[in-house]
């Protein structure tokens, strides 16, 4: 598929070949970045970052990626600093911003907002998270992290832990992992199980899936444990949140009987689901994961801008 001008809205829009193109381009750009520091692929290009929802890693990672490519960045980190506060529609905001930029990255609390932005804009739009729906760039950096650690994605046993109902990162990741020969363990409280339609679709694609509420019973099997926080802001009422708050914590005790090769990932931010004492163990790679966001987003920006 032609990359120049392409939107990145959902991992469902990607084939396995598309994913591999992004991963191999990220690997190449990471090497070049480490050798040269500043690259010039995107010289003269402008990225607009439109964040209608809070973000630390995704926004800064995209900005860092664009600067590393030699481009520049405009945008806002919260809707209150834009004309949205005055009642401007998303459609008009997008049409305005595209006059100033070559590519748009958007995060929005409403599912489908990124797709709408892509339909309106004549320049590439990249989804940085739309509600509890999709977070495709996080998924790509997660896959890149796993491949860097293990040399492959095939043959691994991967556990997704925590908020599998509202967590957009795990929805996207599970769908992408269906392209690979992996066993997927879905570990969550009953109230926060992976949506049934996603599980059914994954099984139809031939994926082997184990669903459980008990982390301690399966953690010894895993090669990768992908931990997520309970997403308080997505719950319809606080009582439902309080029922599941603090359901799991990964600490040194629970790691006593795991594989030596187990790697623990987290899209961050974390609350209390991974104890800080785990950070110094060889199992923890969530800060490496943060770094990996830069070359992966460099790859996506370079590809959709048609500069690589």
From Swiss-Prot:
This is Aspartate carbamoyltransferase catalytic subunit. Catalyzes the condensation of carbamoyl phosphate and aspartate to form carbamoyl aspartate and inorganic phosphate, the committed step in the de novo pyrimidine nucleotide biosynthesis pathway. It catalyses: carbamoyl phosphate + L-aspartate = N-carbamoyl-L-aspartate + phosphate + H(+). It comes from the Archaea. Its EC number is 2.1.3.2. Coiled coil: none annotated. The gene is pyrB. PANTHER family: ASPARTATE CARBAMOYLTRANSFERASE (PTHR45753:SF6), ORNITHINE CARBAMOYLTRANSFERASE, MITOCHONDRIAL (PTHR45753). GO terms for biological process: 'de novo' pyrimidine nucleobase biosynthetic process; 'de novo' UMP biosynthetic process; amino acid metabolic process. Carbamoyl phosphate binds at residues 57-58, 107, 135, 138, 268-269. GO terms for molecular function: amino acid binding; aspartate carbamoyltransferase activity. Heterooligomer of catalytic and regulatory chains. It comes from Pyrococcus horikoshii (strain ATCC 700860 / DSM 12428 / JCM 9974 / NBRC 100139 / OT-3). L-aspartate binds at residues 86, 168, 229. Pathway: Pyrimidine metabolism; UMP biosynthesis via de novo pathway; (S)-dihydroorotate from bicarbonate: step 2/3. Keywords: Pyrimidine biosynthesis, Transferase. InterPro entries: Asp/Orn_carbamoyltranf_P-bd (IPR006132), Asp/Orn_carbamoylTrfase (IPR006130), Asp/Orn_carbamoylTrfase_sf (IPR036901), Asp_carbamoyltransf (IPR002082), Asp_carbamoyltransf_Asp/Orn-bd (IPR006131). Belongs to the aspartate/ornithine carbamoyltransferase superfamily. ATCase family.
